[in-house]
Amino acid sequence: MAKLNTPKGKLVRKLGVNIFGNPKFDRLLSKKGYGPGQHGKSGKRFSTYSVQLQEKQKIKFTYGMLEKQFRNYFEKASQMKGETGLNLLVMLESRLDNVIYKLGFAPTRPAARQLVSHGHFLVNNKKVN
């Protein structure tokens, strides 16, 4: 499984939201409220496509997924009955690594994902990775 090697601070400044939940990034956003790079963010208006893309990227980075995995979840959610966005959110929140993070067994989502992939948790008395 591939992972992102982008510095987290740069990613947080680019998105403008602390998606990792670390207080360090809250301080970073309060000190530097502009985007990364030499000139920061420009004052131009964003198109609807760019806003949708940025929201999708926030979700992907929050849950630590790549594009193909996210697309598969979206397709499953769109085939289910009900609202697609709500179904997608329910599916993402019910992933084992997210549940372990929410229960407090791991300090971060990537740490929870590592614990799951190393087989430290049993589901119905079977190792799950």
Task: Spell out what each predicted region is.
Residues 106-109:
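Beta-rich strand-turn-strand
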